């Protein structure tokens, strides 16, 4: 994966900056793809103390796109098929590079003076998958983790990567999924949620009938409510 990265799209806090949300886009998208959702969250609920960071994935060769470059957090070698096959074909190197990137992004916010419990990491599809992995393996306790239409990466070895005393063992995790998702099957997300629950993580799982690989207003409203709950105004 290329080390060259475009600086994230940033929505500064409208008042004193006391919290940060890092929201991560999916394959082929950019941070701009989620700008309108962020603008709605900011406008409707007046999260004036929250800074929103929308990172941009680097342009990398994507196997399912005939090796052509597109924005991606890691390579996708196959779409569809059984879960075991999908896991065997994970781009472990690319995943770990992005995991490090998000850990560094979180640390930058902490270094700027934001308490880690006032940071939420979340995303959609590939971005949600990275958020789950990076969030749960972060050494600082976060305020919350969100995975929309996503799944747990490195699931076969995840249990060996974590321990009961980890900082984010009790961090609230919310996973949302469309029941008609043709790209990341709902069952894959459900298995991920069940695996995490089995390991003792605080995971809430919700599905949306008729929803494909996308986001619907009801889901975005629930994300908004989660952010308000985890990041209430301090001033």
Curated annotation (Swiss-Prot):
Primary site of residence: cytoplasm
EC number(s) recorded for this UniProt protein: 3.1.2.-, 3.1.2.22
Alphabetic keyword roster: Cytoplasm, Fatty acid metabolism, Hydrolase, Lipid metabolism, Nucleus, Serine esterase
GO cellular component, one term: nucleus
Entry keyword annotation includes Hydrolase: yes
Single annotated GO MF: palmitoyl-(protein) hydrolase activity
Annotated SUPFAM superfamilies: alpha/beta-Hydrolases
Function per UniProt: Hydrolyzes fatty acids from S-acylated cysteine residues in proteins with a strong preference for palmitoylated G-alpha proteins over other acyl substrates. Mediates the deacylation of G-alpha proteins such as GPA1 in vivo, but has weak or no activity toward palmitoylated Ras proteins. Has weak lysophospholipase activity in vitro; however such activity may not exist in vivo.
Family listed: Belongs to the AB hydrolase superfamily. AB hydrolase 2 family.
Protein name per UniProt: Acyl-protein thioesterase 1
Species of origin: Gibberella zeae (strain ATCC MYA-4620 / CBS 123657 / FGSC 9075 / NRRL 31084 / PH-1)
Highest classification ranks of the organism: Eukaryota, Fungi, Dikarya, Ascomycota, Pezizomycotina
